[in-house]
């Protein structure tokens, strides 16, 4: 019985070593687009692996300028 558990554990570790993680979408690696205009719009952007709220100035935006946290998380995690 212990040999089966050990074999299972070794198998799990072996699979874990060779699992390839998918790289983040390039969109998710961009800095938050603050914008240069005078607006003060609440938006979400991926920062250090989390979708965080920031204030967007209203122009010169990028594709990672999400209106909702759920949409940011759906695209970037």
Curated annotation (Swiss-Prot):
Keywords: Blood coagulation cascade inhibiting toxin, Disulfide bond, Hemostasis impairing toxin, Protease inhibitor, Secreted, Serine protease inhibitor, Signal, Toxin
Disulfide bonds: 28-76, 37-59, 51-72
Gene3D superfamilies: Pancreatic trypsin inhibitor Kunitz domain
Tissue specificity note: Expressed by the venom gland.
SMART domains: KU (SM00131)
SUPFAM superfamilies listed in its UniProt record: BPTI-like
Role summary: Serine protease inhibitor that inhibits trypsin (Ki=550 nM) and thrombin (Ki=26000 nM). Exerts anticoagulant activity probably by the way of inhibiting thrombin.
Name this polypeptide is given: Kunitz-type serine protease inhibitor bicolin
Species annotation: Vespa bicolor (Black shield wasp)
């Amino acid at each position: 019985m212990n040999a089966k558990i050990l074999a299972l554990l070794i198998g799990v570790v072996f699979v874990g070593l060779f699992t390839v993680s998918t790289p983040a979408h390039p969109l998710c690696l961009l800095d938050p687009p603050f914008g240069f205009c005078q607006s003060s719009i609440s938006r979400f952007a991926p920062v250090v692996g989390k979708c965080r709220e920031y204030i967007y100035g209203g122009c010169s935006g990028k594709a990672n300028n999400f209106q909702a946290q759920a949409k940011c998380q759906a695209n970037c995690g």
